[in-house]
Every structure is written in structure tokens, then in C-alpha cells.
Amino acid sequence: LLSLGLTRLAGMAPGARQIGLSATVAAPADMARFLDCAGPVAVIDGGPGPRPEIAVMAAAARVPWAGHMTLHAMADVYDAIRGQQTTLVFVNTRAQAEVVFNHLWRLNEDSLPIALHHGSLDVGQRRKVEAAMVRGDLRAVVCTSTLDLGIDWGAVDLVIQVGAPKGLSR
């Protein structure tokens, strides 16, 4: 479909400049050939960007023997959210997202704008959360990996992964 659209545009405006942008394409030279430009092609690589700071959060509370689901660390997660402008709190399942969100909401004595995002929520509700996040209206979003699927997050100061991620790419 993209190829057909580009061909039609080339027929309508043969001298038009084509610009292809991607943050994730694995082979930029192949993408440049796909654009099928008549003139010269420049591939500009912005580089990997700054190295992320990665740390393991040590909770002040003791880890319970069973049934904890990281809830013993929610006060520490809330304190981390308070110290940043925008935080994403990733969990692995929708059920975890609901539980973590509810615990953080109970701790939220500062009335920080905290939202919930997962695949079982109404599409309209998810879009509202995404738009509020892009505008910078939210201090934190508790979410599953549905939030990282092609969304421009804007400025995110802190990302917290609660529990082990499902895969290495996360």
C-alpha cells in the first residue's frame, strides 16, 4: 500500500522530494532503495543517543515469603514517581497493571495525576491516556507493553519495570 501511494505521488509530482524517517528500521540502505528515488539518496544515522541509566531499585520493606507480586515496593515506586516529571511503570499483565495502579492510587496523598493503560481498556480511554501523556499532563502511567507499540511518549524521565520483563527486547 505504501509502495502504491509513493508511485502515485511520483506520477503526480515527479520532482517532489521524498523523505523517509524511521527510528527502528534495521537496514537503512534497503529502505533507501525501497523509496526508489531518481536522484541521490542520503542516509543520515542519528546514532544511538545517550546511554540510559539503569539501576535496580532496592525496596525499603522486606520481601514477603509468598504472594507479594512486588507490592512491598509500592511505597518506593511512589517515591520515585514523586521525584520525576513523567514515569512509566511497566508490568507484565493486565491484572498486575490493575493491582499496581490501585496500590499506587491508595498511596497517592499528593493527588498526582496517575493513569492506567492496558489492552483490555476501552480504546477511547487508552487514547485519552496516550494524549494526556504526550501533553505532559500525567506524572505516571502504569502500563503493559501495549503502551510501547509505536507511541511517541514525549519526555519520559523514568521507566520502572515491575518484575522481570517477558523478553529481552523489553
Task: Identify what each model region corresponds to.
Residues 1-170:
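Helicase motor core with emphasis on the C-terminal RecA-like subdomain
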